[in-house]
């Protein structure tokens, strides 16, 4: 019986092939597929907030709340990978592998990263404003309080605030950066496992476990935060400057390091070094 998954070496080659396709993709495809990728990740975030709204205030153990949150969130990346789209964090793995193997260029990578980041933001904002805020899904209690607490924790830059009668300390800039490295290490491993599998069930399992892990641990995903924090802005409690300065910048930088170095470069070095060709 034929194997339903690729070897690690063949998976690395397949990732380079994906990078080559992304290098050649028209700008219109990049824009549309990046928009839907941001929306898909936001769907996962919306589901997670709806599923866990009020659990902490009701006295549920913190670890169990995180497990439920992380258990439902992976639907977002399943949609991204299986339906097909352009996710900035996954591209942080693909494109450096393409560069190192000579199948992608630096300028093509910059275009891909900037385009996917910007339109991931547009897609996530659409879901946050239209499907989470205007619909009233996250504006009623207990979901509103949960959404605002999550946004403040991510965006207040180390400041303290009161949530459910308790003092909470938000993440500092450097904490977001380090957590973002761990996040995209796991996210890109999820993508890598999905590439390794040749069937939908295998891809789904390959995605679910690493994504559940990063969410439960509390790592920082820049595209997910393009949903979580703006919801808090729309409801009230966080500003746009706090969103960009205290989270988007460190989360973006950390996600690049986590995906490019700890997954892309490591697997290229392990399986593909010495087989590359030059590309301008």
Swiss-Prot record:
Subcellular location: Cell membrane
InterPro entries noted in UniProt: Aquaporin-like, For/NO2_transpt, For/NO2_transpt_CS
Gene3D superfamilies: Glycerol uptake facilitator protein
Protein name, per record: Probable formate transporter
PROSITE patterns (UniProt xref): FORMATE_NITRITE_TP_1 (PS01005), FORMATE_NITRITE_TP_2 (PS01006)
Keyword list, A-Z: Cell membrane, Membrane, Transmembrane, Transmembrane helix, Transport
Record carries keyword Metal-binding: no
Family classification: Belongs to the FNT transporter (TC 1.A.16) family.
One of the protein's GO biological processes: nitrite transport
Annotated NCBIfam families: fnt
Entry's transmembrane regions: 33-49, 67-83, 116-133, 177-195, 204-219, 253-272
Topology in the lipid bilayer: Multi-pass membrane protein
Function according to Swiss-Prot or TrEMBL: May act as a formate transporter.
Pfam families in UniProt: Form_Nir_trans (PF01226)
Annotated GO CC locations: plasma membrane
Molecular function, one GO term: formate transmembrane transporter activity
Gene assigned in the entry: fdhC
Coiled-coil residues: none
Organism: Methanobacterium formicicum
